[in-house]
Amino acid sequence: NSRHQWWIEQGISKERLELDKVKDEDLSHYSKSTIDIIYNFPHGKEELEGIANRTDFDLGSHTKNQNEFEISSKVISNKDSTTKLVIQNLENKKWFVPYVIEPSAGVERGVLALLNEAYFEDEKNSRLVLKLKPHLSPIKAAVIPLKRNNDELVNKAKLLKKELQKIGLGRVMLENSGNIG
């Protein structure tokens, strides 16, 4: 499942993810099949995303001249439609209403799951670390001169920051509020 893989690529551990096929009796009236992507939070399991096969219900409901096409869903006649939402099969030249696959994810749960995965307690150095995947990190690099009161080092750090920005690295931060060396 490509959506399952997408969550893993964002930083979600595959061991904490489950795919759950929704039982037929629990499906929405328009759905032929729905798969939920479940995340195992510390407080329990919750759905991150649902992926529904909505069949031809959506496009069939909104297409013009519905009776000209074999629509598998039970749709109400739509006399106001001005467009035929159909595709032609190039092999047999028949027109058909395509199915819609609808992924539906909540931002809040997704972000919470990502933060849960990225949160790390570095006990050796007594600090908390947020280990985001590089493509999610708002800051791609930090340039930190060893001494803030050394003009030569600070100027070189500023130059390095500009060079990193020029190559398109992303957001680069210059941190010179204290000494690290």
Q: What would you call each of these model-derived segments?
A:
Residues 1-181:
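NTP/phosphate- and nucleic-acid-binding module
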